[in-house]
Amino acid sequence: MSNNPHPQDDGSQLYDNFEISPPSIVIRKADTDQSLNKIMLNQESQDINNYYTENVKNDNNPNNSYQDYTFSGNSSNQQHQQQQQQHLYEDLPTQFHYSNNSFFEPPPAPTVELTDDPLPNFNYPPSNIYINDNASDISLNTKDLPQFTTNEFLSPTSQLSTPFSPGHYSQSSQDFLQVNHTNGSGNNNNNNNNNNLLNPRSPSQYSSHSLYSDNSSQPASPFLDAASHVSNNSFIPPVIPTALSDVGSQNLDPSHNLGLSANQHFDSVNEFLSTGEIQLGQSVSSTNLPSMEEDSIKWGGGNGQEAYTSLAMMEQRASADNSGMRLATHQFSETQIKQEDQQTNMNHQYTFSNPQMNFDFDITVTPPPQQLEVKPFGNDKDMNNSSGTTNNNNNNSQFDIVSTAATNNSNQLLTENNLSNYNQLQRTEQGNDNDSLQIHRDATGIIISINQAPEEIAAKTPSLFSNSSANSSIHNSPRSDIDNKSGQYYNNGGDGNSLVPNSQLLPSSPNSNNDNYGGGGSSNDENNLLNPEEFQSVKRGRRKSHASRTSTNPNSLSPRSRSRSRSSAKSSNDAVISDNDESDDVLQSREKMLELALPSSSSKRTQKHPSLYACHLCDKRFTRPYNLKSHIRTHTQEKPFICSKCGKSFARSHDKKRHELLHQGIKNFKCEGYLQDGTRWGCGKSFARADALRRHFQTEAGKQCVKRLLLEEQANSSGKPLATSSGVEIT
């Protein structure tokens, strides 16, 4: 700024305003991206404002020009300033217009041209940084770190570097912990110092670790763990310390060294590792337990020999290797030996003892029972007669084995085929020596004990299929009749729970021989079998027995009984009313519809035929062998009949047939029929089962369907009202 307090003319005042030393900057154009120098921008702001005021004055005077300005004062100084100002005007941008109609804009901010990069260079490291690209040679450089002597620290500093590091120096014997062995004269053995050093790059020769394994050679030692590199055996010869003793104690008995020489080590002797013995200070582990049994069998007693302990065996081996070292073997007293022999002979007990720890480790093995001799079944008398007294002495220790399909495989289910041979499995016979009863077992030695049903309970038990009730007497059973006779039906001893053929219980025909009923089977079995024609005649006779009685005295029976007497085309009355066993094959007829609509009288009927067939596994009895066979399958869970559509299994064939009709969509039972005058009745609904149609007749809609049929039956029965299945009388 100008320091002249007196104002001058316009021309001189303009240059006085620029009386300042020019800054050492270079004016860049507006499109440059250099940083601003804020200090110099603030310094020139006042001069620019003064220049703007003079420029306005010059615009008002059109005769003035920049070339007409005259300078006053020091001509040399003003001339120098004028040249600098002219040079400044030449470098001004084009937006500075000194015309009347131009608007003044300030010049761009001055910038400083940088010659050096102010940011540090990260491309190249400094020379004092050591970098090695070899991954295997990565180490800690300790050249510039303070060094410590081995007297101050146990771990030498040379262990922290590798031979490739710059600060590496050769290892010396003073950098390591030395193990000095004192000989008998008391002098140190300095010749073996190099061999006794703890080498950090390899496992120590006295370490508890192996070179190829992370597991310790003493896996169950209480003083070592799997990650320990400190050896308890770092003594020459190595000493196995006893339990609860100081680790590394040198005041141990030399007899505990197990006969190892000074150049041998516990890890290098594979014989001790394979013996499986429990060392002193160790416990039972998975590494030594499998071989303990082998050593106990090899060295232990059982045949009158003395049982060697694990320590005694190791001492004997050590004494065999070192002749100069005599180890005493622990001897037991005579009483202890006798007791151990008795226990060994009785319980096969193997004892592992440690005399220093005063404890015994016993393992008791219970052997399986000795298998007795097998006597063939069916040849008892022949063997007893031929062998004489030899077999008589062994009769009490032998078992009779019956090889059947039911007992050869314990997982096999009971079936009706092997149930017929069940009496042979429990057959008993008289002994030769003491007349005692011997139980005959199967090959597995397992007896299936099933309590037989008493006769009294079986007689009072109602049948599941044949409507047997308390009216059935014990005398109706063929078992009592057979027992009263000679008892020759059962060839195996007279057990009455076997399936008896139908021909033995009832005569198959009027021409059948009655002598065969109690004789003993002299005739062929084919003659005693029931023929299919005769069986069908028996069924028809049972169905017509009631109809024949109604024909003799029709007035003594109810109208419902007379309607049932005219039923000659039905297949099975019991199947429809009680269990529906044969209802699928029944034709739709007038009598069938009446039976379904009228209430059943099964509770009022008495059993006409005896329950001849009893179940072996429960108290139930049946009048037909088919019903018994189907019932036994409920015990054995046997379902041999399989549906061809869905694979569902059934115990009875007619159940499978009825189920297959559901897949086919066949419904044989319809709610429809014709009256005697030809009028149709019913709603026409179809049902797959007869019991479903009977339930339909019990509904309100079903009562209306069957009402006309019941009215017609009432008219035919001399005007007496009929009671429907719901208990309502038809009037």
Curated annotation (Swiss-Prot):
Cross-referenced InterPro entries: Snail/Krueppel_Znf (IPR050527), Znf_C2H2_sf (IPR036236), Znf_C2H2_type (IPR013087)
Composition bias, Polar residues: 54-77
Lipid biosynthesis as UniProt keyword: no
Post-translational modification: Probably phosphorylated in a calcineurin-dependent manner.
Zn-finger (C2H2-type) residues: 613-635, 641-663, 669-700
Induction behaviour: Expression is higher in white cells than opaque cells. Induced during exposure to the weak acid stress of acetic acid, through the regulation by the transcription factor MNL1.
Protein name, as recorded: Transcriptional regulator CRZ1
Designated gene of the protein: CRZ1
